[in-house]
């Protein structure tokens, strides 16, 4: 039995300069480590990210409490455990925490251990992490699917210090035949967008996720700039590239009026009006995927949007579902959305993440594995995307080392898989 010999938690730094938790799990022959990200626009149903709240240190964002739980009760409970028993180990940590949202130890503490355990187990088995995750997920053994990337290119909302309300404007390189080709396309388009912005005298400052964060007079202007950068790169919108947006609509929703406040355009929309506003953008700019197009507090609005757009556009629930099987089941029962964004730290363990992916797939929902705005160099989500054949991944632009690390890992995985890997093909009625 490959026993866990030691567990060491430590405080490290994420891409925003804030502390986060890293855990190293030791077994005979070596160790493996994992670090966890954090979000800026955080859904109310997410598992708790434990912070120190000591304003004298890192403005209250330290994670020494979470680290102390890794090095204390979690360490004590897991030493001597079989490192390959992922579900048992995750269950022990969840039960020790004893809360519904992991508020005692913190999802950041539990997830860092959970991912490090998976990495150590894959090392013991002498298989790549994606293969070990595939085994845990009980995926079909014949082929694995390489994910199609959704590549953030312009940032707004809470991810940027600008006037755009929509949080992310993304490109999807549907014309690519491999992940390597998709990355090339994304890199070239991003480069040309910078040139276009610069030539127009528009700021090329970056947002939290590495996309450009210019001040613009409308969302349509942002989409026009992206369209221009696609064409300047020699690609064709709708044929080679389609677009996606993340509205992060919970941040725009005024619960007192039940309206969406689009400050950049000085407009207020009802749920229905916001749906048709997004639909008009989708038709004009080949937007095939809309994430959080309604607030997590507006389930009726989300149901209406799904009824109107769900048969032709990928409608993703992020804050709505928070990678939580109970919330996802509610959405399935009410026919709300048709896809789910998967963020490991929203739920706080690998086992629960895999359970949510499986439930979504069984219900016919699309699955998109996602990074967070405060990222680390950890590449686990690349392996999770492949190991579960999720189909899509959202991990930022081809820029900034914490984002590029995931793309480079996907390049390596594609090379290792060879003909056993199939690149995901996006199918959408808007594209036909």
UniProtKB/Swiss-Prot annotation:
What InterPro entries does the record tag this protein with? Enolase, Enolase-like_C_sf, Enolase-like_N, Enolase_C, Enolase_CS, Enolase_N
Single biological process term from Gene Ontology:
glycolytic process
Question: So what does this thing catalyse?
Answer: (2R)-2-phosphoglycerate = phosphoenolpyruvate + H2O
Which cysteine pairs are joined by S-S bonds? none
UniProt similarity note: Belongs to the enolase family.
Q: What does this protein do?
A: Catalyzes the reversible conversion of 2-phosphoglycerate (2-PG) into phosphoenolpyruvate (PEP). It is essential for the degradation of carbohydrates via glycolysis.
Q: Which NCBIfam families match?
A: eno
- The protein's name: Enolase
Q: Which organism is it from?
A: Blochmanniella pennsylvanica (strain BPEN)
Phylogenetic lineage: Bacteria, Pseudomonadati, Pseudomonadota, Gammaproteobacteria, Enterobacterales
């Amino acid at each position: 039995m490959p026993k866990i010999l030691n567990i060491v938690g430590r405080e490290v730094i994420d891409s925003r300069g804030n502390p986060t938790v890293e855990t190293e799990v030791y077994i005979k022959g070596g160790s493996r480590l994992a670090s966890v990200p954090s979000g800026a626009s955080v859904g109310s149903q997410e598992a708790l990210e434990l912070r120190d709240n000591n304003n004298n240190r890192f403005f209250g964002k330290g994670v020494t409490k979470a680290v102390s739980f890794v090095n204390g009760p979690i360490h004590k409970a897991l030493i001597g455990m079989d490192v390959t028993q992922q579900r048992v180990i995750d269950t022990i940590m969840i039960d020790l925490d004893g809360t519904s949202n992991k508020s005692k130890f913190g999802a950041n503490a539990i997830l860092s251990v959970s991912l490090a355990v998976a990495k150590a187990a894959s090392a013991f088995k002498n298989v790549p992490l994606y293969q070990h995750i595939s085994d845990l997920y009980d995926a079909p053994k014949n082929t694995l699917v390489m994910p199609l990337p959704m590549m953030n290119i312009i940032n707004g909302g809470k991810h940027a210090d600008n006037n755009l309300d929509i949080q992310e404007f993304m490109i999807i390189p549907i014309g690519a035949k491999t992940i390597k080709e998709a990355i090339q396309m994304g890199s070239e388009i991003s480069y040309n967008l910078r040139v276009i912005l610069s030539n127009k005298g528009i700021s090329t400052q970056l947002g939290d996720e590495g996309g450009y964060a210019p001040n613009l007079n409308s969302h349509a202007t942002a989409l026009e700039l992206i369209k221009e950068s696609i064409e300047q790169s020699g690609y064709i919108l709708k044929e080679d590239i389609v677009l996606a947006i993340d509205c992060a609509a919970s941040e725009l929703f005024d619960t007192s009026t039940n309206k969406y406040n689009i400050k950049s355009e000085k407009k207020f929309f009802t749920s229905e009006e916001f749906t048709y506003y997004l639909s008009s953008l989708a038709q004009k700019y080949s937007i095939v995927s809309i994430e959080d197009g309604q607030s997590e507090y507006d389930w009726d609005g989300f149901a209406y949007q799904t009824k109107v757009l769900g048969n032709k556009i990928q409608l993703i629930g992020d804050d709505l579902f928070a990678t939580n099987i109970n919330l996802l089941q509610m959405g399935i029962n009410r026919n709300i959305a048709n896809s789910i964004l998967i963020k490991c730290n929203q739920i706080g363990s690998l086992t629960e993440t895999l359970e949510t992916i499986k439930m979504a797939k069984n219900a016919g929902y699309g699955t998109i594995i996602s990074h967070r705005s405060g990222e680390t160099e950890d590449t686990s989500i690349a392996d999770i995307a492949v190991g579960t054949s999720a189909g899509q991944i959202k991990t930022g632009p081809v820029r900034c080392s914490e984002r590029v690390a995931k793309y480079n890992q996907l390049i390596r995985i594609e090379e290792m898989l060879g003909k056993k890997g199939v690149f995901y093909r996006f199918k959408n009625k808007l594209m036909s």
